[in-house]
Amino acid sequence: MVQTTTLGYPRIGRDRELKRASEAYWAGAQGADALRATGAALRRAHWEAQRAAGIDLIPVNDFSLYDHVLDAIALVGAVPARYRWHGELVDLDTYFAMARGVQRADLDAPALEMTKWFDTNYHYLVPEWHAGQRFHLASTKLFDEVAEAQALGIVAKPVLVGPFSLALLGKPQDERVQPLGEILAGLVAVYGEALDRLAEAGVGWIQLDEPCLVQDRTAEELTALRDAYAALATHKGQAKLLVQTYFGHVGESYETLAALPVDGIGLDLVRGRENLALLRRHGFPAGKTLVAGIVDGRNVWRTDLAAALAVLEDAATVVPRERLLVAPSCSLLHVPYDATREEGIDAEVRGWLAFAEQKLAEVVTLGRALNEGRAAVAADLAASTAAATERATSPHVHDGAVRERLAQERMSARAPYAERRPLQDARLGLPPLPTTTIGSFPQTAEVRKTRASSKG
């Protein structure tokens, strides 16, 4: 029987509860207990929403007070020395100091660098790697949230950034550091301890996210991946280990990925449609489960369910249906909660939208179609097809006047580069390699003072 899962869920709250609670904590208007209570209420609401929608395996530890990569940094104790952390469990003040920087009379430390999470608009905090760095379990968040979910009867699937991707996403602080050498080895040791504890807690599946596998990887890097998972597999006990990829296809890494000693592989079948060709070309290992990411987790539009079902049926010719899990293509972190709450929007456009809650329903519908046949979901398929057709032909999408203007511009002759260059130089006066900023600067006391003095 085909089951369903998600890879992650929005965090901020339907009414931005997390934003308000965090800002109140930072301002000193409420304490840590109130912030933690808000987090617990949001987690419960998110788990219950997914269970009510019919999702079988529900992610846990996808929730974060700030950033999931920062949570991984705390888990392994990769706290830079400037925060004066002494190896104990990472507390909220240290956690937020890494996220936002800290300026006190006795301590002035900038935040960790922030950069884009692959090609999304989400930004993550960049781990800092040092020569001789040592790691140890320094946060109980992962285990606490698993226990929290289990107490509610949730079929919990713990989710972590995988150690291979975590090592690559970090930034070496000097040239001696080898991210896939001593750093990865240290991370694997701590992740092994974490897997031991999760297995003891009785979880069924453990999801390790390895999005770096959708980037080109060298033979040496894939060897490091293979060695890392050979070690991790010895710690999973009775739990099943899932390596989850997203944001594209895995390309030449497919065969190495498929051969890892794990129980499941997650592939993006939306932005990584080439993964379907890889499945057909190379097959899929017997006994393993495929998490088929078929509902787009990154956009706000309804899925064309008939087209998505055709892709799943194609995949099912390679992977037996009892070893298929239907899922979004990535975490639903990137979309809002509920499209039905959008009131100030054109009714036609609103009918094309699917936010997190609607995408849960789409995942469940596709799972049901594979289990019971197309006839069982005929009404859903028809409504989806009608919405897709309407959107494809709507004047909201296709404006004849714009098309005509663009056609005229394409027909106009453009001046040769040799003529445009001196005109641009005269008007703009830019150097050969102009630079700019994206508007983000470290929030040190000196920067804050300078900015305040310039406001007039």
Where are these regions (language model features)?
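Domain-level signal for soluble alpha/beta catalytic cores
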Residues: M1-G456
